[in-house]
Amino acid sequence: MTETSEAVEIAVGTPAAKHSESFVFERSIQTVGRRKEAVVRVRLVLGTGKFDLNGRSLEDYFPNKVHQQLIKAPLVTVERTRNFDIFALLHGGGPSGQAGALRLGIARALILASPEDRPALKKAGFLTRDPRSTERKKYGLKKARKAPQYSKR
């Protein structure tokens, strides 16, 4: 028995596995998520729900519980929190941007793993790339839109 088939049997044996035939894939699924200045490369592998973010655990990398919930949301939506291990390389941006980028990358990877989950993820808004980014500062102004105080005389 190969290592892949053993992993598939473990994943199928878990109660959260609804569609066992869609979990069969030879190698890991790789996707990219972006938000603000953050870029995250996600690798989804059959496993037990472990996160490896730049070599650290989810709790170490994102101590904020809000960010942790944001990241786990796509997995919770499709009820697959314990079926996959997630390895991610995060760079650029801050914690909020990286968390949003990781969420998008995970959602995209889940669709490649099981396409029947697409409607649920799309309805929840996990597949939409947030286009908002920082507006540049203009000369003559203090910030992007904040002008210096106007004095008539």
UniProtKB/Swiss-Prot annotation:
GO process terms (BP): translation
PROSITE patterns from the UniProt entry: RIBOSOMAL_S9 (PS00360)
Keyword flag Cell division: no
Acetylation in keyword set: no
Keyword terms: Ribonucleoprotein, Ribosomal protein
Chain segments carrying region Disordered: 122-153
Cysteines joined through disulfide linkages: none
InterPro entries per record: Ribosomal_Su5_D2-typ_SF (IPR020568), Ribosomal_uS9 (IPR000754), Ribosomal_uS9_bac/plastid (IPR023035), Ribosomal_uS9_CS (IPR020574), Ribsml_uS5_D2-typ_fold_subgr (IPR014721)
GO cellular component: cytoplasm; small ribosomal subunit
Protein's recorded name: Small ribosomal subunit protein uS9
Organism annotation: Mycobacterium leprae (strain TN)
Name of the gene encoding the protein in the UniProt record: rpsI
